[in-house]
DNA sequence: CGATTTTGACCTGCGC
DNA sequence: GCGCAGGTCAAAATCG
């Protein structure tokens, strides 16, 4: 996927909405000194405003450049990752989306582009090889197996994995993704000392989405969130009904993760997971930058106001 | 007081 | 058939 296809870096941050409306210095004949003073005051504040706007404009430019750089490095990373993947597991390319069954051949699993299943080195000993395979199998099943009687629709439920960097001291096992979740279970699993938390979307039973969150055994600073299924509703911050309706609301909620998540779901399973990992990391680092989020919020609200005017 | 979380019990599928 | 492990349920506890 081309990074720039979902991130329009030509975004007009709209931080200069008044530039076209600045009063031209037409000298009119002012009859009284009172009026003259008033005009001088206005002129002064206008020049102050202009200065401020210039400053904001240059900041805007810097942000745009920053964004372009981020997209560039995203594309580089993505290409690099694809190259690595095609070199390491060419057979993977030919397989379809795996069915969630315990008997699933581990090699067919496509959901772990990074780390989790590659922490142990390959060993030529058949016994250990088997053991290694078994461990991989277990790890993968950990995130995929579903032993409940499943309906057809559930069987087709999309599974995606998201890695979220967190503080190692944070034991809450919460991943902020814009949706509201209700925890319904927690379990300690065999090959990971940290427990796994089970969440259902708060809109359940109408929304079938579930997620599992567990700290990565290999990198405790990472939370591994596994999503099953797709939301059949908007996020809690969105207006009800039509996703495209902006409804003239002046509130802008930055939900980069969610938006990208939805985009990624349109691709196949493997790409989906890869993209989400990268997107998640990008989004989390961007949303941590308060300046960026503020500027983006201003830009979006500016756009909305502009649209509502036209 | 309703919503949410916790946690032990129970269910289910799989391998032996 | 049995044991194991992951997933879910539901009563109790906690929170806002």
UniProtKB/Swiss-Prot annotation:
Its main location: nucleus. Transmembrane segments: none annotated. Induction: By salicylic acid and pathogens. Transcription factor. Interacts specifically with the W box (5'-(T)TGAC[CT]-3'), a frequently occurring elicitor-responsive cis-acting element. Positively modulates defense-related gene expression and disease resistance. GO terms for molecular function: DNA-binding transcription factor activity; identical protein binding; sequence-specific DNA binding. PANTHER family: WRKY FAMILY TRANSCRIPTION FACTOR-RELATED (PTHR31429:SF76), WRKY TRANSCRIPTION FACTOR 36-RELATED (PTHR31429). Belongs to the WRKY group II-a family. Keywords: DNA-binding, Nucleus, Transcription, Transcription regulation. Residues 170-236 bind DNA. Constitutive expression at high level causes severe abnormality in plant growth. This is WRKY transcription factor 18. Gene3D superfamilies: WRKY domain. GO terms for biological process: defense response to bacterium; defense response to fungus; regulation of defense response; response to molecule of bacterial origin; response to salicylic acid. Residues 82-145, 230-250 are annotated as: Disordered. It is found in: Nucleus. It comes from Arabidopsis thaliana (Mouse-ear cress). GO terms for cellular component: nucleus. The keyword Plastid does not apply. It holds the Pfam family WRKY.
């Amino acid at each position: 996927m081309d990074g720039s296809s979902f991130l329009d870096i030509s975004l007009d941050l709209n931080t200069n909405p008044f530039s076209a409306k600045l009063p031209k210095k037409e000298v009119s004949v002012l009859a009284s000194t009172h009026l003259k003073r008033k005009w001088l005051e206005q002129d002064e504040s206008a020049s102050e405003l202009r200065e401020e706007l210039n400053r904001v404009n240059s900041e805007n430019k810097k942000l745009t450049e920053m964004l372009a750089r981020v997209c560039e490095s995203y594309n580089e990373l993505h290409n690099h990752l694809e190259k690595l993947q095609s070199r390491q597991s060419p057979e993977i390319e030919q397989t379809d989306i795996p069915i969630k069954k315990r008997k699933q051949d581990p090699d067919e699993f496509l959901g772990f582009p990074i780390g989790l299943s590659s922490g142990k080195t390959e060993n030529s000993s058949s016994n250990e090889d088997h053991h290694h395979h078994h461990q991989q199998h277990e790890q993968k099943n950990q995130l995929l197996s579903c032993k409940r009687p499943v309906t057809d629709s559930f069987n087709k439920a999309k599974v995606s994995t998201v890695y979220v960097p967190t503080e190692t001291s944070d034991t809450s096992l919460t991943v902020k993704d814009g949706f509201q979740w209700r925890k319904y279970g927690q379990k300690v699993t065999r090959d990971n000392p940290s427990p796994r938390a089970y969440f259902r979307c708060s809109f359940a039973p109408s929304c079938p989405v579930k997620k599992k969150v567990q700290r990565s055994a290999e990198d405790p600073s990472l939370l591994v969130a596994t999503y099953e299924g797709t939301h059949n509703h908007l996020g809690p911050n969105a207006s009800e009904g039509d996703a495209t309706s902006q409804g003239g609301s002046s509130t802008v909620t930055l939900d980069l993760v969610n938006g990208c998540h939805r985009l990624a779901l349109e691709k196949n399973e493997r790409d989906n997971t890869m993209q989400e990992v990268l997107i998640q990391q990008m989004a989390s680092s961007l949303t941590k930058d308060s300046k960026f989020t503020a500027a983006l919020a201003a830009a979006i609200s500016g756009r909305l106001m502009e649209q509502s005017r036209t």
